[in-house]
């Protein structure tokens, strides 16, 4: 891995780690446009509801849905985030550059407040990365 890729990977993993520290978060991961899990995973002690193969399929479906949403960017503006509420888990997807931050939380969590909190974490990380670049 070259230095730039290592820094991006480290920054994305740091973001996922910070999100996993939030209360009621089960999973935080960065998904590529092709549906591959780039970084992230489940919080320690959490048992996934689905097996590895089902999760890979799910990641791909989230990536495809995100790519289809781009068709409407000219009409509605850029996609920011979406929420899904299910019986066993709620899901938040946030578009970050060419990746999708996928977050699973326990049901009943205010997903809009969570999206705002995660956006502030993203902003803090970007500010930290920018300041680090200025020092280099």
What are these model-predicted stretches?
Residues 1-136:
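Non-catalytic interaction/Regulatory regions outside core domains
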